[in-house]
Amino acid sequence: MRMEHIYKFQHWLFFIGLGVLLSLSLSVKANDFEGSNDRRSIALKARSFVSINENRTALSRKLLLSPDIGDGTNRIGQDCSKDDIVLFQGSTNPLPSGVPSYTVEIFNSCVSDCNIAEIHVSCGWFSSVRLVNPRVFRRLDYDDCLVNDGQPLGPGQSLSFQYANSFSYPLSVASVSCF
């Protein structure tokens, strides 16, 4: 059941990302063609748009294939980073007392064999009316919360918890340790 939840979450994440990329692409194209009435200028802009994207694709493939580029863009086979931890937060049904409730999902999006531990989240003065399992998420100090009791989160693994407060806390990944 847990793996099924992870796969559904990964599919959901993929389709949202795809939708965002598609909408950005369409808005860029629409802005390029705006104000152009003549067919020749539209054709030239369309050709330049396509060639820019072809160059980006070629560059991306080159970065993936060349292991000697040391600028950090080639991440295949290298250590993980805090960017591999994706944190989602959304509102859920309020408590019977009317206090707003929120669900947080923390996901290791690393595609290679990387276990990420000691995940620290910037969380302000995080507190909750609803009890949050301290092994899953707990505040250590101001703006420092620990995820999964410091234990590793494997590639593709996620965990979630719910909290209740009069407002949602802005949560972001502060630091991680890679294994």
Curated annotation (Swiss-Prot):
Keywords: Signal. One of its GO terms (biological process) is response to heat. Pfam families: TPD1_C (PF24068). The keyword Signal applies. InterPro entries: TPD1. Residues 1-30 form the signal peptide. PANTHER family: PROTEIN TAPETUM DETERMINANT 1-LIKE-RELATED, TPD1 PROTEIN HOMOLOG 1. This is TPD1 protein homolog 1. It comes from Arabidopsis thaliana (Mouse-ear cress).
